[in-house]
Amino acid sequence: MSYYQHPSAIVDDGAQIGSDSRVWHFVHICAGARIGAGVSLGQNVFVGNKVVIGDRCKIQNNVSVYDNVTLEEGVFCGPSMVFTNVYNPRSLIERKDQYRNTLVKKGATLGANCTIVCGVTIGEYAFVGAGAVINKNVPSYALMVGVPARQIGWMSEFGEQLQLNEQGEAVCSHSGARYVLNGKILSKVDV
C-alpha cells in the first residue's frame, strides 16, 4: 500500500487509490472509486462507487462524494460541502437510474458548506464561496456566492480576486499572471 490509511477508515476491495494519498479517520471508500495520487480525504469523508477524484485533490471533513461526481486535478472541497446526485429525490420513489453527472474541473475551489446540485459543470479554477448553492454551470475562473449562487467576479489560478480594467484585462497581484475577458469567457494569457 503506497498511501496512508487511518485504522478507522474503510476501503472496500477494488477501490483504486494513488500513491502518497492520505485517508483519514472514519473515511469510507466504495469498491468502484478511482482516486488519484497525492489526494487528502479528511475525517468522515464518503466516496461512492462511480466517483473519480483526480491527483492532488483535497477533500475536507464531512464531505460525501456521491456516484457520478468527477473531480479533476487539484480540486478543493471545503468542510461539510454537499454534492447531490438526484435532482428531485423522494424517499418512496427509486431514482438510482436518474443520477446526473457532475464535473468539477481542474483547480476549482468549493467553499465550506456550499451545495452543488447535480448535473452541472464547474469550470477550471472557479471559486464557489462558503454556503453558496450552485444549480447551473459555472464558467472557468468565476467567483460565485449566494443562494442561488450568482457570479460577482473573477478569480486567478492563485486564488485571488481579479480587478479587471476597462479593456477587460487583469494581472494577479501575487503571481503576475495575466488574464483577459472576451465576452463572458476569462482566459489566462500565456506570456
From Swiss-Prot:
Protein family per UniProt: Belongs to the transferase hexapeptide repeat family.
Species of provenance: Pseudomonas aeruginosa (strain ATCC 15692 / DSM 22644 / CIP 104116 / JCM 14847 / LMG 12228 / 1C / PRS 101 / PAO1)
Gene name, Swiss-Prot/TrEMBL: wbpD
Record annotation: effect of changing K136A: Reduction in catalytic activity
SUBUNIT field: Homotrimer.
Reaction equations catalysed: UDP-2-acetamido-3-amino-2,3-dideoxy-alpha-D-glucuronate + acetyl-CoA = UDP-2,3-diacetamido-2,3-dideoxy-alpha-D-glucuronate + CoA + H(+)
Gene3D superfamilies: 2.20.70.110, Hexapeptide repeat proteins (2.160.10.10)
Protein name listed in UniProt: UDP-2-acetamido-3-amino-2,3-dideoxy-D-glucuronate N-acetyltransferase
Any one GO BP annotation for this protein: O antigen biosynthetic process
Pathway: Bacterial outer membrane biogenesis; LPS O-antigen biosynthesis
The enzyme's E.C. designation: 2.3.1.201
Entry's Gene Ontology molecular function annotations: acetyltransferase activity; acyltransferase activity
